[in-house]
């Protein structure tokens, strides 16, 4: 059946990711970071599958731990001193927790961008910004699709080189280096040619010209309007909560901020609902899909 949220209007998809990415980077409250990471994990697992999610986590979790370890080595602020390092600088609880928070934020943002690349395709991006910033939208759409396209082409080139006995993983060190350089040269040439061909193709079709019309398969339906209203409500509610201090949290000089007040709990729940919106939509769609045959 596929992901139900991906079939919504591109404006809904883009607004959702703009909100979750912005709040994931701005809100350093521990509860907000945990909620953002949870939502990103669930949605990435839904889009990519468990194996792909495990592969992403094998990269993200070491980054989280590295941030928690590196930050105390350079940041010695905080009033809760645990021990003194051989250099004489204190190791504080606040610096460790801030490193964990920064690592969690980084992991959540990376996972949200993984979901972004799966949902916001190049045609959606061009549809949203093609008339406003045609040149920049074309460059950004090409950039977004470059990495997965580059990986697929690299695998094709590696298999072709393997079939003719020039695999970069066999032979002496000098042979492996030469073959790796050859593959790299092939990929650079392919990337440049692909970019030029894409630009020439778009130019020949009149892309970016004033008054140019374009066919679009996207239509704003009632569900998209409801989704936009919901996302707008969540975004404004969280903005008001942040400005009112309901989501404030300080790591230095000591840990303090809003935690279990009813005023703050309402913001946590709204943020949780925002981050889980794609998952909830997909579960609801799956339930309707399962129930519909029984009613026939």
Stretches found by the model and what they are:
Residues 34-46, 62-70, 119-122, 206:
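Short, charged N-terminal helix-start/capping segments
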Residues 30, 49-50, 133-136:
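Membrane-helix interface segments
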Residues 56-174, 287-296:
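Juxtamembrane/interface alpha-helical elements of multi-pass membrane proteins
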